[in-house]
């Protein structure tokens, strides 16, 4: 099983053109209802967009807000989300580094945020504090924000375990989507034969054998 600790530095850090990697072909059936969990609703697709709704809460067996040692005294509550994802994402030549805030959405309809807190930027490092280092995240990789909105700040561990080997490693379906429209995968989480760590660019992305760019979260055995 994967060790949770290596995910402390995971982020969608930039978008840029990369060389092809011929090791994998990801599943691009993003309009297939089986790509998503039962927590999303009103899934619809056209040639340009994937759209769906969610209430912002994961499966009921995900144990939320446990393992947090630096609580902000918030509690996850239902929200009304509507997501619209482009089906024709484009890569930027110049990389873009996100700041604290949302950077994507998971396939269970829960927002994915940058790993940083909204704390002040460290003048020496140029970075904000890490939510994981600050002890603000639960065992699933998320917490409730100031609006009682649950969201992930690192790889969504409980969601990936819920999706399982079949979807993640065999069918190679995404675990989420970045705000730029590119899918997020977890190849190598269960099966080291799918480990693409050495093939990723500085944005934690790569291009598959059919020309589809995707991001991948870090995993170790």
Q: PLM ranges: what are they?
A:
Residues 198-221:
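Long, compositionally biased interface segments
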Residues 10-19:
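Bacterial N-terminal signal peptides
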Residues 24-133:
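Solvent-exposed N-terminal domain segments of exported/luminal and surface proteins
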Residues 105, 143-147, 207-209:
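Extracellular/periplasmic catalytic domains that process cell-envelope and extracellular macromolecules
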Residues 1-11:
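Bacterial N-terminal signal peptides that target proteins for export
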Residues 130-133, 147-196:
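Short helix-loop boundary/capping segments
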Residues 89, 116-118, 154-158, 188-190, ...:
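A mature extracytoplasmic/lumenal domain signature
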Residues 135-138:
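A structural motif
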């Amino acid at each position: 099983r994967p060790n949770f600790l290596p995910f402390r530095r995971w982020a969608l850090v930039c978008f840029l053109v990369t060389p092809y990697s011929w090791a994998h072909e990801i599943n691009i059936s993003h309009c297939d209802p089986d790509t998503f969990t039962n927590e999303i609703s009103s899934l619809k697709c056209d040639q340009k967009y994937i759209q769906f709704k969610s209430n912002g809460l994961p499966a009921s067996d995900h144990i939320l807000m446990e393992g947090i040692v630096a609580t902000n005294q918030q509690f996850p509550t239902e929200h009304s989300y509507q997501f619209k994802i482009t089906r024709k994402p484009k890569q930027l030549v110049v990389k873009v580094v996100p700041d604290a805030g949302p950077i994507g959405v998971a396939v269970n309809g829960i927002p994915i945020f940058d790993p940083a807190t909204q704390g002040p930027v460290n003048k020496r490092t140029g970075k904000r504090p890490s939510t994981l280092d600050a002890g603000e995240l639960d065992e699933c990789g998320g917490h409730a924000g100031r609006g009682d909105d649950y969201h992930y700040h690192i790889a969504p561990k409980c969601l990936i375990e819920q999706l399982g080997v079949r979807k993640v490693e065999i069918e190679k379906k995404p675990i989420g989507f970045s705000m730029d429209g590119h899918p997020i995968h977890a190849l190598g989480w269960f099966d080291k034969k799918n480990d693409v760590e050495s093939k990723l660019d500085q944005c934690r992305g790569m291009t598959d054998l059919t020309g589809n760019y995707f991001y991948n979260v870090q995993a170790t055995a």
